[in-house]
């Protein structure tokens, strides 16, 4: 069912100005996006918006003026918002995703990644909303890839543990919810440090200084536009099929180390890469990370859900605004 509300506009004509009232149709399908100010959340918000959904995006520190301010740790505020908006779907993108920050702020990370997710699951169930909880490949230890949805999790760090606890809390409190595990993400960042992939670009551009790049951990960089499309496809399939629930995996299919990512970035922009040095030793002293947490995505592929953008295409779209050499940017894109 679609709702209607009034909108006003000013009409100008020679010698005359008038205020005109129009009936505006509001799409009947309502989506609530948490973490809508973040890298993935922005992409999900845009994907649903462009596909005729009435979308309410929520954020915290960067919420105003575009998005609704919402403290996910305020259970009463979460309940009030969901009861008022009555979404058909909630895409839960908000999380503390940085492993090093989780290690240094464990209590806050647990509140956001676990407790807030549990509360959201309960409220979603209360209004009959389909909830997609975005999780991580870090729930696995990376020793026996590829990992299926029913593979036994064994997170190596606190971030992975909080995401796994969040999964279990969501599925325990909302049997109709879905968990979508994804790997490291990149996309249209507001600053290079917003993604563990795009932050590498400065190492590529400043070729006057050699840079040691990790060539040990195996990653599958995934474009946020692809994940957003999968969220939309899952949601629209769920509207027709209530069996769409439980755990799913989605990932890019190009296996790359950080060294290989930076070489691909250099290739995408025709930049030198000889200053980049591969380091094959396992990092020492850092927060433990899985060697190869590759996700098996066949469960979604078998039901015709998925979208993949080649890394060199997606990374070029994401990084060209940050090119130091503006001449190249003008030549290629204008």
Swiss-Prot record:
One of its GO terms (molecular function) is methionine adenosyltransferase regulator activity. GO terms for cellular component: methionine adenosyltransferase complex. Residues 319-334 are annotated as: Required for interaction with MAT2A. NADP(+) binds at residues 37-40, 60-62, 71-72, 93, 97, 159, 185. Keywords: NADP, One-carbon metabolism. It comes from the Eukaryota. Pfam families: RmlD_sub_bind (PF04321). Pathway: Amino-acid biosynthesis; S-adenosyl-L-methionine biosynthesis; S-adenosyl-L-methionine from L-methionine: step 1/1. InterPro entries: dTDP_dehydrorham_reduct, NAD(P)-bd_dom_sf, RmlD-like-bd. One of its GO terms (biological process) is S-adenosylmethionine biosynthetic process. Belongs to the dTDP-4-dehydrorhamnose reductase family. MAT2B subfamily. Heterotrimer; composed of a catalytic mat2a homodimer that binds one regulatory mat2b chain. Heterohexamer; composed of a central, catalytic mat2a homotetramer flanked on either side by a regulatory mat2b chain. NADP binding increases the affinity for mat2a. Regulatory subunit of S-adenosylmethionine synthetase 2, an enzyme that catalyzes the formation of S-adenosylmethionine from methionine and ATP. Regulates MAT2A catalytic activity by changing its kinetic properties, increasing its affinity for L-methionine. Can bind NADP (in vitro). This is Methionine adenosyltransferase 2 subunit beta. It comes from Xenopus tropicalis (Western clawed frog).
């Amino acid at each position: 069912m679609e709702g209607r509300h009034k909108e006003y506009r000013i009409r100008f004509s020679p010698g005359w100005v008038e205020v005109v009232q129009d009936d505006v149709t509001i799409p009947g399908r309502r989506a609530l996006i948490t973490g809508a100010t973040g890298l993935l959340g922005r992409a999900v918000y845009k994907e649903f918006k462009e596909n005729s959904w009435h979308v309410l995006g929520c954020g915290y520190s960067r919420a105003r003026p575009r998005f609704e301010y919402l403290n996910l740790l305020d259970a009463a505020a979460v309940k009030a918002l969901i009861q008022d908006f009555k979404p058909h779907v909630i895409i839960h993108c908000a999380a503390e995703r940085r492993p090093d920050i989780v290690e240094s702020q464990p209590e806050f990370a647990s509140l956001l990644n676990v407790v807030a997710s549990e509360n959201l699951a309960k409220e979603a169930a209360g209004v009959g909303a389909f909830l997609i909880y975005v999780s991580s490949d870090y729930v696995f230890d990376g020793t026996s890839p590829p990992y299926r949805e029913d593979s036994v999790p064994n997170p190596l760090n606190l971030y992975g543990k909080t995401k796994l606890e969040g999964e279990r809390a969501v599925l325990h409190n909302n049997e109709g919810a879905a968990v979508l595990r994804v790997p490291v993400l990149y996309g249209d960042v507001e600053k290079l440090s917003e993604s563990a992939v795009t932050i590498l670009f400065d190492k590529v551009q400043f070729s006057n200084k050699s840079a040691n790049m990790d060539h040990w951990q195996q990653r599958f960089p995934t474009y946020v536009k692809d994940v957003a499309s999968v969220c939309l496809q899952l949601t629209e399939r769920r509207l027709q099929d209530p069996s769409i629930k439980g755990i799913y995996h989605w990932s890019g299919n190009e296996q790359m180390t950080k060294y290989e990512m930076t070489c691909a970035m250099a290739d995408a922009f025709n930049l030198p890469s000889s200053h980049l040095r591969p380091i094959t030793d396992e990092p020492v002293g850092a927060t433990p990370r899985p060697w190869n947490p590759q996700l098996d995505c066949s469960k979604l592929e078998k039901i015709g859900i998925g979208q993949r953008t080649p890394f060199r295409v997606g990374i070029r779209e994401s990084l060209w605004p940050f090119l130091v050499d503006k001449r190249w940017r003008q030549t290629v894109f204008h």
